[in-house]
Design a protein with these regions (language model features):
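Metal-dependent phosphoester/phosphodiester hydrolase catalytic core
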Residues: 2-23, 32-523
Length: 523
């Protein structure tokens, strides 16, 4: 592989930690991640929770792993699965300060290529002593027009439904891997820090759901160690680790990384919590999140979660942060004041949308735009999301999005598609200005998909402020339907290079297509 060797020793800086799972042997990405946990030879470091890649662009990517002891992370990259002629990137030393996790930043990669990578952990005192390698793969974004495909979803291990080995664990990741996506857009709630688990749960039909349970999953997370344990728990799952080794991730957070429906400055009175200050909890959760996800965001400098990831001339992905700057949950009828995104993020989104040359602009919004999402945690009729349900002119948080949509129309920002999860069912919404109370925008689509492995709910009411019309939905027959009953969903987006048509397919737990919508770009 002809990488620019002046770039080769620019390793990553970020590290982090967790519970030991075991060595994943070398070989293909899927085989490596699926190998049963086992110890390497005595005295050598071992990779405990597999490998992940993330935030992949045409020339850059980040690779994540975790060690069982302090060690130096090294990453080799090659076009060849046998790693002949591979180039090596020197990563960080993984220490207890970051729970022994770490990221290596890969730069100078070739565009539009499928690349194989493998991670080894080098002993800090004995030269040449390393762990067994763990392999993964990624596809860099193309420089020229090329087919692009990705999947999205959210909500993993929610409502007490965790890893059930009897049902294949988080088997939706097998279905997602089967469509061979270039990357996975995680719409948040990758962990449920406020969701303790029990070993068994009685199902309505008389069966018993059996959870794998770790110590950190027996109570709500409050300490940094407990928040770290939420991420380690999900990485105990074989299908999830295999998927991570095969498919890079674009990650954004939602509420359950901290606790349900939280907002900055909140002081809670909820069962199980001794720490009442949400800002304290959020800071701990944020640190664990950065330690355990393959993002390029650097927590040490207060890195922004909102960012744009370009994946070739056909696609830009705008990752929103609808948590960090969020105003308090109220009845949301304010005519002035802050909203969900904050002034800095709104200005960034407008600027980047206007500057984007990509055919398609994916807006990754972890909260739906047109669905009414109640928040009853304070015993009041408060609202958690954007829509406030009166079908009238924009009020409360709707005002920010009216501003963004109006700006996009004024500056001819075409071909925006909004993707979300959060509400635990799947749906397709068309936003029609002819049916809207606020009509100063171009029509667009929003697609909802999830959960990955959590209780299924819905459907939620649609708000008419932006003319949302329901085109498809599938929701469970009752609230908190377990994954054993189905109603787990993901979405797939495929962009055809020749026609530039973007096709969205909503799929179920087994990958069955439920609804397909091709979209032709507006010129």
């Amino acid at each position: 592989m002809e990488l620019d060797r002046r770039n080769l020793l620019r390793g990553g800086l970020v590290a982090g930690g967790g519970a030991a799972l075991g060595l994943l042997s070398s070989g293909t990405a899927g085989a490596a991640a699926r190998t049963a946990p086992a110890f390497v030879r005595s005295g050598r470091a071992r990779v405990t929770h597999g490998v992940q890649a993330g935030d992949v662009t045409a020339r850059e990517a980040v690779v994540w792993t975790r060690s069982d002891r302090p060690a130096r992370m090294l990453v080799e990259v090659s076009r060849r699965p046998d790693f002949r002629g591979a180039d090596r990137f020197r990563g960080p030393v993984l220490t207890p300060d970051t729970d022994l996790t770490g990221k290596t930043f890969l730069r100078g990669l070739p565009a539009g290529e499928e690349l194989h990578y493998r991670v080894v952990l080098a002993d800090l005192d004995r030269h040449g002593v390393t762990s067994a390698p763990v392999v993964g793969r990624l596809r860099t974004a193309p420089r020229k027009r090329a087919d692009v495909s990705f999947v999205w979803s959210g909500d993993l291990a929610g409502q007490g439904w965790g890893i059930n080995p009897e049902l294949g664990g988080y088997r939706i990741f097998d279905a997602m891997a089967a469509v061979n996506p270039d990357f996975f857009l995680c719409s948040g709630d990758l962990v449920y820090s406020d969701g303790p688990m029990t070993p068994t749960v009685a199902l309505p039909d008389g069966r018993t759901w059996r959870n794998l349970v770790t110590p950190e999953k027996t109570k709500v997370a409050e300490t940094l160690a407990e928040y770290r344990g939420q991420f380690r728990y999900n990485l105990e799952d074989t299908a999830f680790r295999a998927f991570n080794a095969r498919v890079p991730m674009l990650y954004q957070w939602d509420d359950h990384e901290v606790l349900n429906n939280w907002y900055p400055g909140e002081v809670i009175d909820r069962p199980g919590y001794t720490e009442k200050r949400v800002d304290v909890l959020a800071a701990r959760a944020r640190r664990a999140m950065f330690e355990y996800t393959p993002t390029t965001v650097r927590a040490q400098v207060g890195g922004r979660i909102f960012r744009k990831v370009s994946y070739g001339p056909l696609l830009d992905v705008f990752m929103l942060d609808m948590r960090t700057y969020k105003n308090p949950n109220t009845t949301d009828t304010e005519k002035s004041g802050p909203g969900l995104l904050g002034a800095e993020q709104v200005a960034w989104l407008k600027r980047e949308l206007r500057a984007s040359k990509a055919t398609w602009k994916i807006i990754a919004n972890d909260l739906p735009l047109g669905l009414v999402v109640p928040d009853g945690t304070e015993g009041k009729p408060n609202l958690e999301g954007v829509a406030q349900g009166d079908n009238g002119k924009p009020l409360g948080r709707e005002r920010e999005f009216a501003d963004i949509l109006g700006y996009a129309k004024k500056h001819r920002v075409r071909n925006m598609v909004w993707l979300t999860a959060d509400v635990h069912y799947t749906a397709a919404h068309y936003y029609d200005p002819a049916k809207a109370a606020f009509s100063d925008f171009d029509p667009f689509w929003e697609f909802v998909s999830g959960p990955l492995n959590a209780g299924a709910f819905g459907p939620n009411a649609l708000d008419g402020t932006f003319g949302a019309t329901l085109k498809f939905q599938q929701a469970p027959p009752h609230a908190n339907t377990s994954p054993a009953e189905g109603f787990q969903f993901f979405g797939q987006v495929a962009i055809d290079a020749a026609s530039e048509t973007l096709t969205v397919t909503l799929r179920d737990l087994d990958g069955k297509a439920l609804y397909t919508k091709p979209l032709t770009p507006v010129r």
